[in-house]
A protein has these predicted regions:
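N-terminal secretory signal peptides that target proteins for export/translocation
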Residues: 1-2
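Sec-dependent N-terminal signal peptides
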Residues: 5-14
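C-terminal motif of bacterial Sec signal peptides marking the signal peptidase cleavage site
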Residues: 16-19
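Flexible, acidic/histidine-containing loops and adjacent segments that form or flank the divalent-metal
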Residues: 22-47, 53-54, 103-106, 112-119, ...
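Conserved beta-strand hairpin/beta-sheet module of binuclear metal-dependent hydrolase folds
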Residues: 39-119
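Histidine-centered divalent metal-coordination motifs
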Residues: 124-129
Length: 200
């Protein structure tokens, strides 16, 4: 009786071992095309680009009608904790915003808009989404704010409409949750942008 149970148990385990030993499928042709450039955007297509700088989140979208959107533009800066997570991509010869702008200008060529962004949407106010305000944030004469993340992108490219979750009071979900030097820097950028739009 015990030998029958043992045999039955061994037979039942065979499919498990067989599935673990499956041959890998034939190589996909797409694998050989990894280093080819993505095709240019065409009217009627939706292009979604995740831009990896190794320093924060950024995504660039071109909608079927040619409308463009940037989702976040983070800049964690360069410090030990950041480098333990991921190296700067493609390298640290430029700031994250400069890599983002270079990427956008390349893929927006069919639009003939010099990389202009119709909408920039910030999902939330963490540094990996809007930029940090540490020693690596760039100070520029004549600006009330430092260049980092979205403020740096906005200084290099035209952003028509900026969408965030707090304007104008920045108290969502509570004012205490929307604090920090990086947020103060971002608010200065927004204030300056609003003044310029109003011609003040």
């Amino acid at each position: 009786m015990n030998s029958k149970i043992l045999f039955l148990g061994a037979v039942m385990m065979l499919p498990t071992f067989a599935s673990c030993q499956q041959e890998k499928p034939f190589p996909d042709d797409a694998v050989d095309k990894v280093y080819e450039y993505l095709p240019e955007w065409q009217a009627g297509y939706l292009d979604i680009h995740q831009i990896s700088t190794g320093r924060g989140n950024a995504a660039y979208l071109i909608f079927p009608d040619g409308t463009t959107m940037l989702l976040d533009a983070g800049d964690l800066g360069v410090h030990t904790g950041t480098q333990e997570i991921m190296n700067a991509v493609p390298n640290d010869s430029k700031r994250p915003a400069e890599w983002i702008v270079q990427y956008i200008k390349h893929f927006s060529l069919p639009l003939k808009n010099n990389g202009a962004i119709d909408y920039a949407l910030l999902t939330h106010f963490d540094t990996d989404h809007i930029g940090q305000n540490g020693k690596l944030a760039i100070e520029k004469v004549g600006l009330d704010y430092k260049l980092t993340g979205i403020t740096h992108v906005g200084n290099l490219l035209d952003i028509s409409t900026l969408i965030d979750r707090g304007y104008p009071t920045y108290d969502y979900p509570t004012a205490a949750k929307v604090t920090g030097a990086h947020i103060s820097n971002y608010k200065l950028y927004v204030t300056g942008k609003v003044k310029r739009m109003k011609g003040l």
